[in-house]
A protein has these predicted regions:
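Primarily the dimerization/phosphotransfer
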Residues: 562-614, 618-631, 635-646
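Helix-loop-helix junctions that connect adjacent transmembrane segments
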Residues: 30-34, 111-127, 155-292
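TM-loop-TM module centered on a large, flexible mid-protein loop between adjacent transmembrane helices
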Residues: 66-68, 73, 105-110, 231-308, ...
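Membrane-interface loop-to-helix entry segments
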Residues: 127-178, 232-236, 369-379, 392-404, ...
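Transmembrane helix-loop boundary segments of multi-pass membrane transporters
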Residues: 24-28, 107, 111-125, 148-158, ...
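Loop-to-transmembrane helix boundary motifs in multi-pass membrane proteins
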Residues: 1, 89, 126-133, 222-227, ...
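Extracellular loop-to-transmembrane helix junctions
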Residues: 16-120, 235-238, 433-435
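A generic transmembrane alpha-helix motif of multi-pass inner-membrane proteins
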Residues: 395-551
Length: 658
């Protein structure tokens, strides 16, 4: 039950209650969102099959990191872990910083007290900062206690979350069944039904990020890992149902002055309080203030499950890396409850400055989450395909290949802005991704220098790809920055022209202002398309250059390896010859010494004829000469067998060496 609460709780958080009004309905409408979420859930289940296979193959802590290191090497494990850590920690930050937002919409200005300042147009108040700091500390402490406490909290909050949503939705159905299930229009009228469904489906990595978090704690399971897929299945289906219920609910009720949800969503920024959140407005319409309390408790429960679940996932990932001696051993020390307490403390300390940055800045970091999640899904699907191929498991080979292709599609979809997507990451998010990737190189250098077992640094392709990612992201950041600057400049030019018209008492009609705005938007769209095309061409040229550079580097390495092998072969051959000559010389010298000795004895015998003495002298001379040759061969073989080392000593041509 605890594992199910972890999977479901990590997948559904604050965003599930906000995104229907800000993203889902404007993109696709209620039914477009429902169909897209259903397809997205199916895609996540395909990836879930890959996780399930790998959890049974490698049932230890670390999740994707563990699978990648076992199947592809530690380089790949480090890269996947680097992005996964950001995913889990950023979700902690997003959920913690959502508590003040919930209070603002439901409690008004209650916590808008204390010191006040703003960052990136977001107002930050001292009381709200203390509220977030308290949540970070409280649920970090709950996770440190571990055991029954953390399991009970997670299960209770997950039940509150799901049944709170179910109660609100069922009451709405009982009052306005047809209107809730069939809110008109079912799809947005300005795009094809197929395209809007796809646009929602590709949000699946963001919507369901965390459903796989149980893979980080596999070695702590009190049940067989074979049951993990059923847990992820229920978690994903429950998460998908939550997103669909909230979207249908948001579209079913709107203020009386609006004819449908489209006009209401278009003017949503004009509202404050719970009216600015379509899900809360609809709940108030159907259940009054009681409904707001029920839904508010459900939202708070979703925030808490996200905090606790991602604390657990991030700490287990850090623990696994420390256990492999990639991080200091301090991180893998367990407390009396068997919890990696220091890893959780590190996450808490890292999180304490975050509330002071404001929600907007945190949103920039959270935008990078989708990229990190897709990288993890790419790795898990790839290693599942490889491992299944080795094991002869055809079904998992299929899911691994499908998951790999889909995850790569997700990655490109979110990385290239305004090409396939309705909206890309913010300019600041690209800069954060660049910074995090560069920090990844710094971290790699840190562990490479301390890798006593020489496990790191064996995949040149991986780090060339990482370098390409930095270059590519840098181009996209520059492109987005130029686009933002151009938008500001064109807006200033437009305001200047309007002011000049006013000086000459020329007032533009509403239609003329709309036409001018439409023209500016059209020109910005053309500029955006041109910049996207140029960026893709630049990316292709960069990719080609890196490919050629890597090919040359690979050829150089192969040549050096070949020369090294030839050198080793020549040395072995020379050593074999030297050994043979040494043995042969020894075998010949022994009888030759005997011959010389016997000749000497014979020469001492009395009565030898002069002719015999002459022959003996010639034999002796020939034997001595042959022994000299044999000794030279033996000395040469000994010299070749051992290397001679020469040392350096300071000296001068003008002083005699001592």
């Amino acid at each position: 039950m605890g594992a199910l609460a972890l999977s479901f709780g990590c997948a559904v958080g604050w965003g599930a209650f906000i995104m229907p009004g800000t993203t889902f309905l404007p993109i696709a409408g209620p039914w477009g969102t429902a169909l897209g979420m259903a397809l997205g859930a199916f895609v996540m289940l395909v990836i879930g099959v890959n996780y399930h296979f790998m959890m049974n193959r490698h049932p230890d802590a670390g999740g994707t990191y563990s699978y990648a290191k076992h199947e592809l090497g530690y380089d790949h494990g480090v890269l996947s872990a680097w992005f996964l850590i950001l995913v889990y920690i950023a979700i902690i930050w997003a959920n913690a910083s959502a508590i003040p937002l919930l209070c603002r919409h439901l409690l008004g200005d209650t916590f808008k007290v204390g010191g006040h300042y703003h960052i990136a147009d977001f107002d930050i108040y001292g009381a709200e900062v203390l509220l977030v700091l308290g949540a970070i500390w409280l649920f970090g402490w709950v996770c440190i206690r571990g055991g029954r406490l953390v399991a009970s909290v997670q299960i209770f909050m997950a039940l509150l979350l799901f049944f709170g949503l179910a109660v609100v939705f069922c009451v709405a159905l009982s009052k306005q069944g047809g209107k809730v299930l069939m809110p008109q229009p079912l799809f947005v009228p300005w795009a094809s039904k197929f395209s809007v469904v796809v646009n929602i489906m590709v949000l699946a990595p963001w919507a369901f990020a965390g459903f796989e978090s149980i893979s980080q704690s596999t070695e702590e399971f009190t049940f067989s890992p074979r049951k993990a897929f059923m847990i992820m299945l229920i978690g994903v289906l429950a998460g998908g149902a939550a997103y669909i219920m909230l979207t249908l609910l948001a579209a079913s009720a709107y203020p009386s002055e609006y004819k449908d949800w489209i006009v209401y969503i278009r003017d949503i920024k004009k509202f404050t309080g719970y009216h600015a959140l379509p899900t809360f407005h609809a709940t108030h319409e159907y259940l009054g203030k009681t409904g707001l309390v029920v839904l508010g408790v459900a939202v708070l429960a979703g925030i808490i499950t996200g905090l606790v679940g991602n604390y657990i996932a991030a700490s287990r990932l850090i623990y696994s890396m420390a256990h492999d001696e990639l991080l200091p051993s301090w991180f893998c020390r367990l407390n009396r409850w068997g919890i990696p307490q220091n890893a959780i403390l590190f996450i808490m300390i890292l999180s304490f400055p975050i509330p002071f940055l404001g929600r907007t800045a945190i949103g920039w970091i959270v935008d990078v989450n989708t990229i990190g999640a897709t990288i993890a899904y790419i790795y898990t699907s790839t290693v599942a395909f490889k491992a299944a191929k080795d094991a002869g498991n055809v079904p998992v080979q299929i899911t691994g290949l499908v998951g790999m292709v889909i995850s790569l599609g997700f990655f490109m979809y979110f990385m290239v802005p305004n090409f396939w997507t309705v909206s890309g990451m913010s300019t600041e998010s690209y800069l954060i991704l660049i910074a995090w990737s560069i920090l990844g190189f710094v971290f790699f250098r840190y562990i490479f220098q301390r890798d006593k077992e020489k496990r790191i640094g064996k995949s040149t392709v991986l780090w060339v790809t990482m370098l390409f990612l930095i270059f590519f992201t840098s181009m996209l950041w520059l492109r987005e920055s130029m686009h933002d600057t151009t938008r500001v400049v064109m807006d200033k030019i437009n305001r200047y022209n309007v002011a000049r018209f006013s000086e000459y008492h020329v007032q533009l009609t509403k239609t003329e202002n709309s036409d001018a705005e439409y023209y500016l938007q059209k020109q910005l769209g053309w500029l955006n398309s041109t910049m996207t095309q140029d960026s893709l061409i630049q990316m292709a040229l960069l990719m080609l250059s890196l490919f050629i550079m890597f090919n040359i580097y690979k050829s150089m390495i192969q040549r050096e390896n070949k020369m090294e092998k030839e050198k080793d072969s020549a040395e072995r051959s020379s050593q074999a010859k030297s050994t043979f000559l040494s043995n042969m010389s020894h075998d010949i010298r022994t009888p030759m010494n005997a011959i010389v000795g016997y000749v000497g004895l014979v020469k001492k015998e009395p009565g030898l004829s002069p002719k015999a003495t002459e022959y003996l002298q010639k034999i002796e001379l020939s034997s001595q000469h042959l022994l000299t040759l044999i000794n030279d061969v033996l000395d040469n073989s000994i010299f070749c067998r051992y290397s001679v080392a020469f040392g350096e000593r300071p000296g001068s041509f003008f002083t005699r060496p001592t």
